[in-house]
Regions:
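A residue-level marker of the well-folded mature domains of exported/periplasmic proteins
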Residues: 2-12, 23-236
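Hydrophobic core of alpha-helical transmembrane segments in multi-pass integral membrane proteins
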Residues: 19-21
Length: 236
């Protein structure tokens, strides 16, 4: 039986972390949801890095976490969908003008914009998911990163034990630091499982160079299924 294994664990984890960490802490080409201007409750907003809040993936899980936080704490939450990178800075600036208490950037593509905004507005608080500035993190920024290689290792290990063709696949979105973690963990898990059961298992890897082109991802998977019976994707 052919199987596609997706990054469900990452999506679920993002909901829990986003909902928990919030306790500590417009319009050109974009869609914005706003609260009431005179509402004095704690106000948190998120901005997407190109995807929408209905992407059935990272952005949607983040927004679900925001809504849960709002329900649990009676705070205000909002979002801005920005399909173009050129929209990032202008809309983060608009959120700053709205006196947002905490501004979230969802995705590593927003790193430069978050860093610039944080330095420009030191009195505001910012956070970014899936990125860390390391030792250069501004004092008013929190970076949230995931140990994606660990969950991917488990997926690879299971794939090694389940494969009947001794060939499994990995489909990535855009190659880079974030998706490299998924590929590395998956390959390591397959290798560990293969060694344990005494098999040679091939791992085929291909990138779509997109997080939104589902047709290309499907085409890659269909071709990969000529040899593979299990595919793991980290592609949005």
């Amino acid at each position: 039986m052919k199987k596609i294994i997706s990054k469900v664990s990452w999506i679920g984890l993002s909901v829990l972390i986003l909902a928990g960490i919030l306790f500590f802490a417009v319009k050109t080409g974009c869609k914005i949801a706003t609260g009431v201007d005179d509402d004095k409750r704690f106000f948190t907003a998120m901005i997407t890095d190109g995807g929408g809040i209905n992407d059935q993936s990272f952005q949607q899980s983040s927004w679900e976490g925001m809504k849960k936080f709002s329900k649990d704490t009676n705070s205000r939450v909002s979002y801005v969908e920005c399909p173009q990178t050129s929209d990032f800075l202008i809309n983060i600036d608009k959120l700053a003008d709205e006196h947002t208490d905490l501004i979230w950037g969802i995705g590593y593509k927003l790193a430069d914009t978050i860093e610039l905004a944080a330095k420009t507005n030191p009195e505001l608080n910012y956070a970014i998911a899936d990125f860390s500035f390391g030792d250069k993190t501004p004092e008013n920024v929190t970076g949230v990163i995931f140990r994606s290689e660990e969950s991917s290792f488990l997926v690879g290990y299971i794939a090694a034990l389940m494969t009947k063709t001794n060939s499994v696949g990995f489909v990535g979105g855009i190659k880079g630091m974030v998706i490299d973690q998924f590929e590395y963990g998956y390959r390591a898990g397959v290798a560990y499982g293969a060694k344990q059961i005494g098999k040679n298992i091939d791992v085929k890897v291909q990138y779509a160079e997109s997080f939104t082109d589902s047709a290309k991802g499907k085409a890659i998977a269909i071709k990969m299924f000529d040899d593979c019976d299990i595919i793991f994707h980290a592609a949005g």
